[in-house]
């Protein structure tokens, strides 16, 4: 079965665009480039879910997920699901519940959560005991999943690397599985991300095999954040594993980092910049959107074809002997 491909809307700023500006034009470009879906930003205070559901459907796409904005640099505020402070944790839980409501209204089936570092990262270990942070994060998951269950929404955990997420709380695929095993919730799954796995997992293929039934969404994000193929991600190995475990969810592509000037030219409220003036932007340097998006997804589809062909030949050889 062929993979389904989505675009992570938040990452459009890396190539100088913004989903909140000329939304319909951007959605049409995503469809024209060859994608099946688009992951929506986790901005429940500014988005009308019903309106976005119609816009996405009119463009011929679907929205698999609402991607939460958790890191301080992305959110512009503290959203800490593992905090020992009740008011801080409750605030983050409420944000997640609001994202669930947005997903339900927008026709998405999943919401992403993670255990992001605070504004000042705590390295190499958190200030508070890891066991305490895990307990608090576990409490948050229970509350969020209960609300999501009422709305028919699944929650997917995205393990972050230790520079962006609390070390020892949710930085590996295995830690994500620990929460699934502990809580036993049928609407809690995992969203692996190639960039983060590259930093944290001893073996990406082994990690994916270990949690195969729990992978419900997947982020394709090159190991250096640049164009797919310019890092050292072994996409063939990853795709072979996903084909082998019969993964039937979406592969969500991140746009690549380009230049500081192009990022600065992405207008609007992105990455915690609400109300801020950004200088140095040059929108004339932006790549053509359809071309940029189609280059990414075609790269992935070509690898998928190669993997499918090798699997077919291997199966044919097995039958021959």
Q: What are the language-model segments listed below?
A:
Residues 1-16, 20-31, 170-192, 196-321:
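Histidine-acidic metal/acid-base catalytic patches
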Residues 1-15, 69-82, 115-125:
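N-terminal small/glycine-rich loop or linker at the start of catalytic domains
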Residues 2, 25-32, 46-71, 101-107, ...:
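Acidic (Asp/Glu)-rich catalytic clusters
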Residues 11-13, 42-44, 69-72, 115-119, ...:
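Active-site-proximal loop/turn and secondary-structure-junction residues that shape catalytic pockets
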Residues 14, 40, 80, 125, ...:
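Conserved short-loop catalytic and cofactor-binding motifs
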Residues 39, 65, 112, 156, ...:
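Conserved beta-strand positions in the central sheet of alpha/beta enzyme cores
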Residues 48, 121, 165, 228, ...:
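Glycine/Thr-rich phosphate-binding loops of Rossmann-like dinucleotide-binding domains
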Residues 58, 82-189, 283, 287-290, ...:
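Active-site acidic/histidine proton-transfer and metal-coordination neighborhood
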């Amino acid at each position: 079965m062929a993979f389904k491909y989505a675009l992570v809307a938040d990452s459009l700023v890396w190539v100088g665009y913004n989903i909140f500006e000329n939304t319909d034009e951007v959605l049409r470009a995503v469809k024209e480039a060859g994608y099946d879906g688009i992951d929506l930003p986790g901005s429940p205070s500014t988005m009308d879910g019903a309106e976005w559901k119609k816009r996405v459907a009119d463009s011929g796409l679907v929205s698999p997920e609402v991607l939460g904005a958790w890191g301080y640099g992305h959110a512009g505020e503290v959203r800490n699901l593992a905090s020992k402070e009740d008011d801080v944790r409750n605030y983050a839980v409420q944000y997640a519940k609001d994202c669930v409501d947005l997903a339900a209204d927008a026709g998405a089936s999943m919401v992403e959560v993670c255990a992001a570092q605070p504004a000042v990262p705590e390295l190499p270990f958190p200030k508070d005991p890891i066991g305490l942070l895990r307990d608090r994060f576990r409490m948050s998951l229970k509350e969020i999943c209960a609300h999501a269950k009422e709305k028919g929404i699944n929650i997917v955990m995205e393990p972050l690397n230790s520079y962006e997420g609390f070390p020892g709380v949710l930085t590996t695929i295995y830690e994500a599985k620990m929460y699934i095993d502990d809580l036993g919730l049928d609407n809690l799954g995992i969203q692996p991300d190639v960039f983060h796995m590259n930093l944290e997992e001893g073996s990406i293929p082994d990690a994916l095999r270990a949690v195969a039934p729990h992978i419900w969404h997947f982020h394709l994000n090159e190991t250096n954040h640049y164009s797919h193929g310019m890092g050292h991600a072994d996409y063939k190995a990853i795709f072979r594993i996903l084909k082998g475990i019969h993964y039937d969810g979406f592969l969500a592509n991140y746009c690549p980092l380009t230049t500081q000037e192009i990022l600065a030219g992405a207008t609007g409220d992105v990455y915690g910049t609400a109300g801020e003036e950004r200088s140095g932007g040059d929108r004339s340097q932006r790549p053509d959107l359809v071309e940029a998006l189609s280059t990414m997804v075609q790269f992935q589809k070509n690898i998928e074809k190669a993997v499918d062909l090798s699997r077919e030949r291997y199966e044919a050889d097995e039958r021959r002997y």
